Amino acid sequence: MKPISNQNYIPRGNLGARAGLLASRLEMREYRPETVLNMDQAGWPGDWEGRTILALVRMAETTKKEPAYLHEIVDIVLAARNERGYLGPIYDGTSDGGTNSGARVNEQQLSGHSWLLRGL
């Protein structure tokens, strides 16, 4: 089977209707700029933000419609980065008695940022 490029395809009929519903869902409160940074309560920095950006980008490619909040979300997420350029705490392997003492890396932080990189 030969795949169809979404550059040359605009979904119509049931598929178009479903794509429209999904695009509308991505404009709900939890995917808006004012809340997207607060949605991850499970300790996966970059995960919710990245999945949101990726979903908006892919939906725009499919529907050929500009997402309402994409650029604003990207701006907010990029502004929230720490001084090393990523979201969440800095793990530097030092032992200062804090919650990140001795940690060099956080698996959830790495995984969450993979979604963010794909979306950007």
Cite the ranges covered by each PLM segment.
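Structural signature of alpha-solenoid helical repeat scaffolds
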Residues: W44, E107-Q108
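Residue-level signature of alpha-solenoid helical repeat scaffolds
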Residues: L54, W115-R118
